[in-house]
Amino acid sequence: MKNPNHKNQVRIIGGEHRSRLINFNNADGLRPTADMVREKLFNWLGQDLTGTTVLDLFSGSGIMSFEAASRNAKMIVAIENNIKTAEKIKQNKKLLNINNLHIHHTDAFSFLRNTPDTFDIIFIDPPYEWQEWHALWQYLPNVLKENAQVYIERKEKIQLPPYLTERKNGKCGISHFVLAEYQKNTETP
């Protein structure tokens, strides 16, 4: 049974909004990336994301988007297909007065097929039961800038497509995570 005193909150760990709490709703498969994993990731990426464009697929709580905004990313796009979860991200955006975060209530594939934008950094952290990796790998190159950094988190060990080169990896609890770099000259679908 769920603890009635438990609050669905997660803390921003770095940058301008460091220590601010954001609330998130209950949704199937929603599990914010752990603090220690985010700390490691942003040590890998750097604490200052000034000038970068960021895509947060499967945004969930929005914590990865808020971490990027807190570190001065130029533009952040959050994709979330659960309407209540997307609305909660919008509420937190307003609360934190973040103007460069754009939230889209849509599925990842619709966004990837239709956006003209490309990104420097992409966060991919779908629910554990999600298994559409092959299709994702087909659409992903369309939105990647040369040398884009792609963070992937999932329950199983991660098999990267040929166009992504693993740079760093780790494990926390049952989550495996990888930071990879896009190489345009390698084989793409």
Residue ranges and their predicted role:
Residues 1-189:
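Class I S-adenosyl-L-methionine-dependent methyltransferase catalytic core
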